[in-house]
């Protein structure tokens, strides 16, 4: 990336930091993780959870959701102003699962948001610790990315369901800040912009008046975020054109869809962070580990080491396969929903299979599901190797396209080819004369046509033994070049419905 110098590292985004050196970053990320851990321990005490119940991922999700809801200023204000039946705007809660007489029971808990905010601040030295909240949002987003396919959302905005590899972070809330923007895929940003433009087309006042100015600022900011993800001059120039449009309409929507398609080959840079559930950080803090003193990174060996030594449990429905449930959560923890399955399998040390072949539903349990038949099992979240997370998108050469399979956005910096079905992708570009024909379009198509599926990305980069903390001896895996591995291919995953 040419503009690397002006960019803050994720860890800086994660902690709202000014420029910091590596140790300061590790310390501030560690501080954030420690705060989440302390909060989780306190909540387990409040809820009188046993050690086993505290390590249950479903309980972790409920507790995380409670604190996110307690700090959701906008929604809280909205709930105050639009009281709805049966919803107390001042309270938050959810299902907590406990083991009673050899059976799992569901208990609905309700807490004052004020009380939850107090516990959170207390665990974070009196601060609001927004970075920690964002971290939990990204963990939820990564879990959603792994669990659901966004076909319906893609089709609604006029995009192709095969573009699902561009949809990282599509369920992140708007308030997830710079760290959230960094992990959003090209398709996610395009979808947000298209929704905005459509509102403008349907509502005459959307861009007008005092509010319209704010809307316009948000539009241009989102355009700049998306522009920053593209790595070729032509794609960036097209984004300038979309941003500067006086009155965004269908031409801009067409341009954005064109750009999203182009990102299947000319991949954008999208950050990947290993965000783990709070029930992993809690026990680590409880055992006396000092994250701030030791330092922590979301993109190095630390999350792998932490998962290596963690016990996490999950509720299992009668006909679910515990190994498949483990894979789902492993992928979410490593932010690997859109990674090539060949690479994930190598790192994990067990075969990672496509979503459609998994016998498991999501991690969350609906309130109407029968608890009598519910079992639980240990999630296997360990890995054979570790690898550095990337945000380059794996293009082989900065200004040139590299082969991008129709469904991969690399997570790990590991050498591989990125096979893709070029005829399928290129077919999407023929005869689409809507929008504008321009030199930029021609240039983008030319670069895509030049891409070769057999080119190698991340040349010389490999995985590391877990004992190799300083990443000194890369092990470069060799993959079957013809056999691409995309997770959502030929798939029947559930849809994500808010």
From Swiss-Prot:
Q: Which family does it belong to?
A: Belongs to the influenza viruses nucleoprotein family.
rRNA processing recorded as keyword: no
Q: Which GO terms describe its molecular function?
A: RNA binding; structural molecule activity
Q: Where is the region Disordered?
A: 1-22
Task: Kindly indicate whether the keyword Amino-acid biosynthesis belongs to this entry.
Answer: no
Keyword terms: Capsid protein, Helical capsid protein, Host nucleus, Host-virus interaction, Ribonucleoprotein, RNA-binding, Viral nucleoprotein, Viral penetration into host nucleus, Virion, Virus entry into host cell
Function of this protein? Answer: Encapsidates the negative strand viral RNA, protecting it from nucleases. The encapsidated genomic RNA is termed the ribonucleoprotein (RNP) and serves as template for transcription and replication. The RNP needs to be localized in the host nucleus to start an infectious cycle, but is too large to diffuse through the nuclear pore complex. NP comprises at least 2 nuclear localization signals that are responsible for the active RNP import into the nucleus through cellular importin alpha/beta pathway.
Q: What is this protein called?
A: Nucleoprotein
Q: Where is this motif: Unconventional nuclear localization signal?
A: 1-18
A GO biological process of this protein is: viral penetration into host nucleus
- Give the result of residue 34 to D, as annotated: In cold-adapted isolate
Q: Name one GO cellular component term.
A: host cell
- Cellular compartment(s): Virion; Host nucleus
Q: How does it assemble?
A: Homomultimerizes to form the nucleocapsid. May bind host exportin-1/XPO1. Binds to viral genomic RNA. Protein-RNA contacts are mediated by a combination of electrostatic interactions between positively charged residues and the phosphate backbone and planar interactions between aromatic side chains and bases.
Per the annotation, the residue ranges of the short sequence motif Bipartite nuclear localization signal are 198-216
**Known InterPro entries for this protein?**
Flu_NP
Q: Where is the composition biased (Basic and acidic residues)?
A: 8-21
Q: Which residues form a coiled coil?
A: none
Protein modification: Late in virus-infected cells, may be cleaved from a 56-kDa protein to a 53-kDa protein by a cellular caspase. This cleavage might be a marker for the onset of apoptosis in infected cells or have a specific function in virus host interaction.
One Pfam match: Flu_NP
């Amino acid at each position: 990336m040419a503009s690397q110098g002006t960019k803050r590292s994720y860890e800086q985004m994660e902690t709202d930091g000014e420029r910091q050196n590596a140790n300061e970053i590790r310390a501030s990320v560690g501080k954030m993780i420690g705060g989440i851990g302390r909060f989780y321990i306190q909540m387990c005490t409040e809820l009188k959870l046993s050690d086993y119940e505290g390590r249950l991922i479903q309980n972790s999700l409920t507790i995380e959701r409670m604190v996110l809801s307690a700090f959701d200023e906008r929604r809280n204000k909205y709930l105050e102003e639009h009281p709805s039946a049966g919803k107390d705007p001042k309270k938050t809660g959810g299902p907590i699962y406990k083991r009673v007489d050899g059976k799992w029971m569901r208990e609905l808990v309700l807490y004052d948001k004020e009380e939850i905010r107090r516990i959170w601040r207390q665990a974070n030295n009196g601060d609001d610790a927004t970075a920690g909240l964002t971290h939990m949002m990204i963990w939820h987003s990564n879990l959603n990315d792994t669990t659901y396919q966004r076909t319906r959302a893609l089709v609604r905005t006029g995009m192709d369901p095969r573009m699902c590899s561009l949809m990282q972070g599509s369920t992140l809330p708007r308030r997830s800040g710079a760290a959230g923007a960094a992990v959003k895929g090209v398709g996610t940003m395009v979808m947000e912009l298209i929704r905005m433009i459509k509102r403008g087309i349907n509502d005459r006042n959307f861009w007008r008046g005092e509010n319209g100015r704010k809307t316009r600022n948000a539009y241009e900011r989102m355009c700049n975020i998306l522009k920053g993800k593209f790595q070729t001059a032509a794609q960036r120039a097209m984004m300038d054109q979309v941003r500067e449009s006086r009155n965004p309409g269908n031409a801009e929507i067409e341009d954005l869809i064109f750009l999203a398609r182009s990102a299947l080959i000319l991949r954008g840079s999208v950050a990947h962070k290993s965000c783990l559930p709070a029930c992993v950080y809690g026990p680590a803090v409880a055992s006396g580990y000092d994250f701030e003193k030791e330092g922590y990174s979301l993109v190095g060996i630390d999350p792998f080491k932490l998962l290596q030594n963690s016990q996490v449990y999950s509720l299992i429905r009668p006909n679910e396969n515990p190994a498949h449930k483990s894979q789902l959560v492993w992928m979410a923890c490593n932010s690997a929903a859109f990674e090539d399955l060949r690479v994930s399998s190598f790192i994990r040390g067990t075969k990672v299979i496509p979503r459609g072949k998994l016998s498991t539903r999501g991690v969350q349990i609906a309130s109407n599901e029968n608890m009598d038949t519910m079992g639980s099992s240990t999630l296997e979240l360990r890995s054979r190797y570790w690898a550095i997370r990337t945000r380059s998108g794996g293009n082989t050469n900065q200004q040139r396209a590299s082969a991008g399979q129709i469904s991969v956005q690399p997570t790990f910096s590991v050498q591989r080819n990125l096979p893709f079905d070029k005829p399928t992708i290129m077919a999407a570009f023929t005869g689409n004369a809507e929008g504008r024909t321009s030199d930029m379009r021609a240039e983008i198509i030319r670069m895509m046509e030049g891409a070769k599926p057999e080119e190698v990305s991340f040349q010389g980069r490999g995985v590391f033994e877990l004992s190799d903390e300083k990443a000194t001896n890369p092990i470069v895996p060799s993959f079957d070049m013809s056999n691409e591995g995309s997770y959502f291919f030929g798939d029947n995953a559930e849809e994500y419905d808010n």
